[in-house]
């Protein structure tokens, strides 16, 4: 609870920055916004709220709800370069995952990534690179590594005629934290594909692959989604929904089935 209280000023600061950026900006077309949301290094402020529900986890058929708060804030460095700051802060509520009758709720560890990316694409190609950080914000012993981590992150994408495809990858190693906890040596890989239409509707699919090099395990999930961009009042939003299909992973970590819903508050320039 103490860590959650400390994070509230950060959340309010992000909200204030977004509100200031929103003022005086012109509306963009629905497809243009959808294409930018498909691009992890687009020059676009957004606040995605990603909800995941996973069922049938482990020996006790546990269930987990994860809300990923994922603010994206671009910073203009020069006429040729931007820095795209991306945060993933998970809030988790799970039952019967760590043991029958067990219940855990709270923050999990945050991942903070900074992508240095060219301001303009070349023939539809864009790329980005930068550091990724693991921050032990977890408020429950079962939801945190209690480790600080750092490593490289990179992505490559191609966009043309409403199509977006590419991949994002990062590797994290722990360098400090609780000595009684296992070290972190983990890679995350996310290939993705999206097709957006003039109406702002779209279809997409990505795979989320997490490899733990110390435990020699790989957890992979396929996420097909249907998306839409619309406006409610003066606020531009994007919505997405789809199943989460487990592909591989150890029995104690892999779910049998899941669902994903995403609500993104968009602040076009």
Where are the predicted features?
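Transmembrane beta-barrel domains of Gram-negative outer membranes and organellar outer membranes
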Residues: 21-269
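Cleavable N-terminal export/targeting peptides
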Residues: 1-30, 269
